[in-house]
Curated annotation (Swiss-Prot):
Primary subcellular site in the record, as a coarse category: cytoplasm
Organism whose genome encodes this protein: Flavobacterium johnsoniae (strain ATCC 17061 / DSM 2064 / JCM 8514 / BCRC 14874 / CCUG 350202 / NBRC 14942 / NCIMB 11054 / UW101) (Cytophaga johnsonae)
Site (Transition state stabilizer): E151
Swiss-Prot/TrEMBL GO biological process terms: pyridoxine biosynthetic process
GO CC annotations, alphabetized: cytosol
Subunit structure: Homooctamer; tetramer of dimers.
Gene: pdxJ
Keyword set, alphabetical order: Cytoplasm, Pyridoxine biosynthesis, Transferase
Locations listed in the record: Cytoplasm
Name of the protein in its database record: Pyridoxine 5'-phosphate synthase
Binding site for 3-amino-2-oxopropyl phosphate: N7, R18, D191, G213, H214
């Protein structure tokens, strides 16, 4: 079964819109796990516009499943991850001020830097994953960084699926097959939803984990958080 890690950035966005502590991020994280979620993902950004660095620290005691911290490995982020020691760190090349992630790493151009950062995290017992596009050269480059896993950036698949083009899965299948051959674990995320997750899961060999936030929280507004988490779990079996 592919594990479901729920990204709770949108909960923090809602909280920060009014100040105070409603909704309570820590309670939501605890409830998601109680409902069956198998992990919690956060993506703190330098401006702390949704997840705050203190949230990352506070969640350490709350997350009893798998704790995944995503972000661009700048100095402050590296320090935060080493302090919190999550189960997994996912390295994402997002620009400062970006609304959301928009591309994977160039694992050839950034290979030496990624290798250095990955080794630091691994020395501290943290599993590493790097965000990549479904491009075979980037998968090969990822292997050379020493990362434990890759996270396939699934925006292109989701867009094509919405248009009715199921062939949009093809590059992801090839990327996953190569990753499996190279011994890389496979995660995936970005624009996955109740509409497309089952098709994606059924076609990607060796898919270990998906990280879903925006769609899941949006769907929960209509269907309820407990219900939506379990709907995803059924589709990921």
């Amino acid at each position: 079964m592919t594990k479901l890690s729920v990204n709770i950035n949108k909960i923090a966005t809602l909280r920060n819109a009014r100040g105070g502590n409603v909704p309570d991020l820590l309670k939501v994280a605890a409830d998601i796990q109680r409902f069956g979620g198998q992990g919690i993902t956060i993506h703190p950004r330098p401006d702390e516009r949704h997840i705050r660095y203190q949230d990352a620290r506070d969640l350490k005691a709350i997350v009893t499943t798998e704790y995944n911290i995503e972000g661009n490995p700048q100095h402050n982020f590296i320090d935060l991850v080493l302090e919190c020691k999550p189960d997994q760190v996912t390295l994402v090349p997002d620009a400062i001020g970006a609304i959301t992630s928009s591309a994977g790493w160039d694992t050839i151009k950034n290979q030496e830097y990624l290798k250095e950062v990955i080794q630091e995290f691994q020395r501290n017992g943290i599993r590493t994953s790097i965000f990549v596009d479904p491009v075979l050269e980037m998968i090969e480059g990822a292997k050379k960084t020493g990362t434990d896993r890759i996270e396939l950036y699934t925006e292109a698949f989701a867009h094509q699926y919405d248009l009715g083009n199921k062939n949009g899965i093809d590059p992801y299948v090839k990327a996953a097959e190569l990753a499996n051959e190279l011994g890389l674990g496979i995660n995936a995320g970005h624009d996955l939803s109740l509409d497309n997750i089952q098709f994606f899961k059924q076609n990607i060999p060796g898919l270990l984990e998906v990280s879903i936030g925006h769609a899941l929280i949006s769907e929960a507004l209509y269907l309820g958080l407990d219900n939506v988490v379990n709907m995803y779990l059924k589709k990921l079996k």
